[in-house]
């Protein structure tokens, strides 16, 4: 085998690889890792049949970031947006667009990120018992209807591509908000003239209350090709297995955010971030990660998201969503 000792896998796909190639990966059982110290949703990706196979690397908890200066123009604050319904957010978005000409937020129209995020915030998946959960999924229907409504009312800008989403809508200063995994922060920070004008909060929900979701992320795994499994386990346990020092350095030097919950108490994570009005956003993100609900995953979730987004776009253009 040409596999390295340790590999990094995207969270959404690792369970299929471990299931299909069980002899290719070494369980992390016996490693000195405080598994209870991680956000449960993040950890769930690397557990197969009750066995730990990976060590989480990063944190992809979704944030909803708002330009507070633009909210103020329509008489709103970040507190008004926290725990709001999507209907409330839509009304604010209409006011923001009328007042400033900016969409409240955007999403990429060539993937299902927004649908997945909104669904997870409701604790519902696109799959059930290994099968697509679409036609009888009332929550999904409401989510898609909400996105159609927001797009028609110029609340949500549906970008034509990932480049359009990143380069035009966010870095082109078209939006008053960003809803995405927190890895989007460096993209936002590239617009330096808006430094200090942003704050983050949780995701709206259909019926109100703070919503939580995660989008993306990866973990580290030991392969059967490893020549010294005990050393590899010790290395992962010492570094990414719960060390606050490792994650303090990773955040300070590389912008890597953790789901190790105790890091929320570290000095580094409690530092105010100038771009976000000197709020300790990384502490907030770690605390949010503890509340992300675990939902059923599938290797086909990306493909399902594309199909669902296509249905949303077709509905915006005049088709019937139920079709």
Segments and roles (model prediction):
Residues 1, 12, 84-88, 158-171:
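Short helix-initiation/N-cap motifs at beta->coil->alpha
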Residues 5-8, 176-181, 199:
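Paired acidic/hydrophobic, glycine-rich loop segments that form the ligand-binding mouth/hinge
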Residues 27-38, 81-82, 124-143, 190-193, ...:
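Short, solvent-exposed loop/beta-turn-alpha elements that line the ligand-binding surface or hinge
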């Amino acid at each position: 085998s040409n596999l390295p000792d340790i590999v990094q896998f995207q969270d959404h796909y690792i369970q299929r690889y471990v299931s299909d190639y069980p002899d290719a990966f070494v369980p992390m059982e016996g490693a000195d890792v405080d598994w209870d110290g991680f956000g449960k949703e993040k950890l769930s990706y690397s557990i197969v049949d009750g066995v730990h196979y990976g060590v989480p690397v990063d944190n992809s908890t979704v944030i909803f970031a708002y330009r507070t200066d633009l909210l103020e123009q329509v008489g709103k604050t970040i507190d008004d947006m926290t725990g709001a319904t999507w209907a409330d957010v839509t009304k604010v978005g209409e006011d923001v667009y009328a007042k400033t000409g900016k969409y409240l937020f955007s999403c990429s129209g060539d993937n299902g990120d927004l649908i997945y995020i909104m669904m997870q915030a409701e604790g519902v998946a696109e799959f059930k018992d290994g099968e697509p959960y679409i036609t009888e999924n009332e929550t999904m229907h409401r989510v898609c209807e909400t996105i159609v409504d927001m797009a028609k009312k110029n609340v949500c800008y549906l970008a034509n591509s990932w480049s359009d989403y990143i380069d035009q809508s966010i870095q082109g200063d078209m939006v008053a908000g960003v809803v995405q995994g927190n890895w989007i922060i460096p993209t936002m920070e590239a617009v330096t003239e808006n430094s200090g004008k942003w704050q983050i909060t949780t995701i709206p929900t259909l019926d109100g209350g703070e919503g939580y979701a995660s989008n993306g992320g990866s973990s580290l795994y030991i392969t059967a090709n490893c020549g010294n499994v005990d050393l590899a386990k010790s290395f992962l346990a010492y570094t990414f297995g719960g060390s606050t020092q490792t994650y303090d350095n990773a955040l300070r030097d590389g912008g890597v955010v953790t789901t190790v919950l105790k890091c929320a108490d570290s000095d580094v994570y409690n530092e105010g971030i100038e771009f976000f009005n000197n709020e300790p956003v990384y502490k907030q993100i770690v605390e949010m990660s503890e509340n992300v609900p675990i939902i059923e995953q599938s290797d086909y979730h990306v493909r399902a998201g594309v199909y669902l987004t296509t249905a949303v776009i077709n509905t915006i253009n005049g088709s019937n969503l139920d079709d």
